């Protein structure tokens, strides 16, 4: 699957996001090493800190389906990932992270997005 095809899946997922407060709908699509695509969306809450980003939603679904760090090949997101999500993407060792930035698709590695990540090593 190309990065563009994965991004198109994220765009389709974004239409299902729950964003009644900001009206900012975000979708994410994770490509697993065995070729499955797992989608996630942002889910807002009236108590703003309790909302969930699309990347977190997709990664949580992947974990619930039995995937672990190293099992995921790529992710596409309809927005630039926040700092917390960059840490999560690094944790799962995403080789390719594609997102829209200022109207263009950008592809980076998780290491490029967060070069000095925190970990236990």
Q: Which residue stretches match the model-derived regions?
A:
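Small-residue (primarily alanine) positions within well-ordered alpha-helices
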Residues: 10, 28-29, 58, 62
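A generic structural signal for short beta-strands and their flanking turns/coil linkers
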Residues: 24-26, 39, 71
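Glycine/charged-rich beta-loop-alpha catalytic/anionic-binding loops adjacent to active sites
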Residues: 34-45, 67-68
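Short, charged low-complexity linear segments at domain edges
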Residues: 52-71
